[in-house]
Regions:
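Hydrophobic transmembrane alpha-helices and their immediate loop junctions
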Residues: 1-169
Length: 169
């Protein structure tokens, strides 16, 4: 039986196991690279949250599990364009952070700085894979739906006589 702890819009799935595993992993993370990866993942999700807030002026429900964070948008009606930009916000945040960090690395290159840069690039690139439930799959589905709606609109306009099919030369 899975337990959940609700704190405002945050939902922690199986919080005792989550905290225990996180504690052990951070205990053995002498290099600090896990912390940098977690920071990149947090920034990624924060990008989604900011765009969601900008669209709807409310915060989404955020589920925290052993596999990471995820935003629940069930019950929220969104256009394909909104869905696309909401999904793209996380990877764009990671790319923006990597670009800012690259400028910083030109001035003073450090191992941790390079690791943070790489963590952001890898987090953004991984989430662009078109595999559900990753952002790339959400973006592809939203793009497909937008094209389908556009084609339906064009077909309606052709049938109603508002526009005519162009002849090939």
């Amino acid at each position: 039986m899975k337990r959940a702890l609700h704190i405002g819009p945050l939902v922690f799935r199986d919080p005792v196991l989550l905290c225990g595993v996180l504690y052990v992993l951070l205990w053995f993370d002498a290099s600090g690279f896990l912390r940098l990866g977690l920071c990149a993942a947090f920034l990624h999700e924060w990008g989604h949250i900011l765009v969601y807030w900008a669209m709807f002026r409310t915060f989404p429900t955020i589920e925290v599990t052993l596999t990471g964070f995820c935003m629940r948008t069930r019950g929220r009606s969104m256009t394909p364009q909104q869905t696309f930009w909401l999904a793209a916000a996380g990877p764009l945040t990671n790319v923006l952070m990597a670009a800012l960090w690259a400028v910083r690395l030109e001035q003073e290159a450090t191992i941790r700085g390079s690791a943070f840069w790489a963590a952001n690039l890898l987090t953004g690139a991984f989430n662009l894979l078109p595999i559900p439930p990753l952002d790339g799959a959400q973006m592809a589905l939203a793009l497909r739906e937008a094209l389908r709606q556009r084609n339906q609109g064009l077909q309606f306009l052709r049938k109603s006589g508002k526009i005519k099919r162009m002849k090939k030369r």
